[in-house]
């Protein structure tokens, strides 16, 4: 073997150590043993020629030569294989090929038990452990178990706050590379996932799957407490907190807790004064996107009646107007079976009815009567003297004690 390390003298140039010797000692094992030896032997059908030399029968290439070259790249950080889609670089061409499957949505490795597909064979191996019930990787912080080391690594970033994947357009960071790829589509406008029913397109496959449930009516996430069901897993997780009372998102300024992260973000704007949603017509700003949308209707007159061509700024006004055409009166008074178009008319009728009813609560000082005890207590504040003579007992009483001794008219 002429090119077998040049008589064992080819070395890792940066560290000045013989590669095969260090491989035997167990050093550099992170990359040499786990990465090179394990994968090359499995993928390239490596055979051992002697105690130090391995050769790939498929490609007729010397194993130690490649091992030395790859070891050097780990120290020099040389990554000659570049992805044309996202500019990410790799040490091995095989890593680039696996990575490109993410962009091409190619998942050639399919699980025989659940037909779930994966873009890398190692991801499939980790997934298959979930069927076997094996989870080898445990988080030191919270004790959660994972079937793949990559899943554990991503999970640990939730504790450390590490977000190594940076968007070069807006400097936003992500803990997963797949989230970065999806985020980039917001800049490019790319929506590669299309619904076959309505041809609506989406930037992420999960969004497409959730959308398709609007056509099928499928609600796979069911609550075992109240039997409510949801199309989206995220909505299901939020709902479960209604039963558990869990509020995992705490405000650092006032320690108020919230069940949803979005509610915490909106709340924090109370402390910061941030109003990120700006109207381009009048430059007015809002803390919530919903408030901006409602405000924008004042400029566009979004809600228009087709019968009279009348426009409304507010959806609630538009709904009330439509009831005129439909002769719909949703507010019903149970005592007289009268129907009302507007809620405020309903409230007014309740007040009128109350005026004709018997007055139950009488104040013995001035003989005024009231429908409710709360109204009687409020009336007592009109009398500014601290003490009155009760006309029933002729004793001096302060207002607080006198309130309890006023009689209810039968």
Swiss-Prot record:
Keywords: Activator, Cytoplasm, DNA-binding, Metal-binding, Nucleus, Phosphoprotein, Repeat, Transcription, Transcription regulation, Zinc, Zinc-finger. Interacts with POU5F1. The gene is Znf322. It is found in: Nucleus; Cytoplasm. PROSITE patterns: ZINC_FINGER_C2H2_1 (PS00028), ZINC_FINGER_C2H2_2 (PS50157). GO terms for molecular function: cis-regulatory region sequence-specific DNA binding; DNA-binding transcription factor activity; zinc ion binding. One of its GO terms (biological process) is positive regulation of stem cell population maintenance. SMART domains: ZnF_C2H2. A zinc finger (C2H2-type) spans 81-103, 109-131, 137-159, 165-187, 193-215, 221-243, 249-271, 277-299, 303-325, 361-383. The lineage of its organism: Eukaryota, Metazoa, Chordata, Craniata, Vertebrata. It comes from Mus musculus (Mouse). Pfam families: zf-C2H2. The modification Phosphoserine is found at residue 400. Significantly enhances POU5F1/OCT4-SOX2-KLF4-MYC (OSKM) mediated reprogramming of mouse embryonic fibroblasts into induced pluripotent stem cells, and can also substitute for SOX2 in this process. Transcriptional activator. Important for maintenance of pluripotency in embryonic stem cells. Binds directly to the POU5F1 distal enhancer and the NANOG proximal promoter, and enhances expression of both genes. Can also bind to numerous other gene promoters and regulates expression of many other pluripotency factors, either directly or indirectly. Promotes inhibition of MAPK signaling during embryonic stem cell differentiation. InterPro entries: Znf_C2H2_sf (IPR036236), Znf_C2H2_type (IPR013087). GO terms for cellular component: centrosome; cytoplasm; cytosol; nucleoplasm; nucleus. Belongs to the krueppel C2H2-type zinc-finger protein family. This is Zinc finger protein 322.
């Amino acid at each position: 073997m002429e090119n077998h390390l040049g008589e064992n003298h080819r070395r890792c140039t940066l560290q000045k150590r013989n590669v095969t010797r260090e491989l035997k000692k167990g050093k550099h094992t992170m990359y040499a043993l786990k990465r090179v030896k394990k994968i090359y032997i499995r993928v390239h059908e490596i055979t051992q020629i002697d105690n130090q030399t391995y050769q790939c029968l498929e490609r007729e290439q010397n194993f130690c030569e490649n091992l030395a070259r790859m070891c050097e790249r780990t120290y020099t950080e040389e990554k000659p294989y570049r992805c044309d889609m996202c500019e990410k670089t790799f040490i091995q061409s095989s890593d680039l090929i696996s990575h490109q499957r993410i962009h091409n949505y190619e998942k050639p490795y399919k699980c025989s038990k659940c037909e779930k597909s994966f873009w890398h064979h190692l991801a499939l191996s980790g997934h298959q452990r979930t069927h076997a019930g094996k989870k080898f990787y445990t988080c030191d912080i919270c004790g959660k178990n994972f079937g793949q080391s990559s899943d554990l690594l991503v999970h640990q970033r939730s504790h450390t706050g590490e977000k190594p994947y940076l968007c070069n357009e807006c400097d936003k960071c992500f803990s997963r590379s797949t989230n970065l790829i999806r985020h980039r589509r917001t800049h490019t406008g790319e929506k590669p996932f299309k619904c076959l029913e309505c041809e609506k397109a989406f930037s992420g496959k999960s969004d497409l799957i959730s959308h398709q449930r609007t056509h099928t009516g499928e609600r796979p996430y069911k609550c075992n407490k109240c039997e409510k069901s949801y199309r989206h897993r995220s909505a299901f997780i939020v709902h479960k907190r209604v039963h558990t009372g869990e509020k995992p998102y705490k405000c650092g300024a006032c320690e108020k807790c919230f069940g949803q992260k979005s509610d915490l973000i909106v709340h924090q704007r109370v402390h910061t004064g941030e109003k990120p949603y700006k109207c381009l017509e009048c430059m007015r700003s809002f803390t919530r996107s919903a408030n901006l949308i409602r405000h924008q209707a004042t400029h566009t007159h979004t809600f228009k009646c087709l019968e009279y061509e009348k426009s409304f700024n507010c959806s609630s006004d538009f709904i009330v107007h439509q009831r005129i055409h439909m002769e719909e009166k949703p507010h019903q008074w149970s005592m007289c079976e009268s129907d009302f178009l507007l809620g405020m008319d309903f409230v007014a009728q309740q007040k009128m009815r109350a005026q004709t009813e018997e007055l139950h609560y009488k104040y013995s000082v001035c003989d005024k009567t009231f429908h409710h005890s709360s109204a009687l207590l409020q009336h007592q504040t009109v009398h500014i003297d601290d003490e009155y003579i009760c006309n029933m007992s002729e004793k001096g009483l302060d207002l607080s004690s006198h309130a309890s001794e006023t009689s209810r008219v039968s």
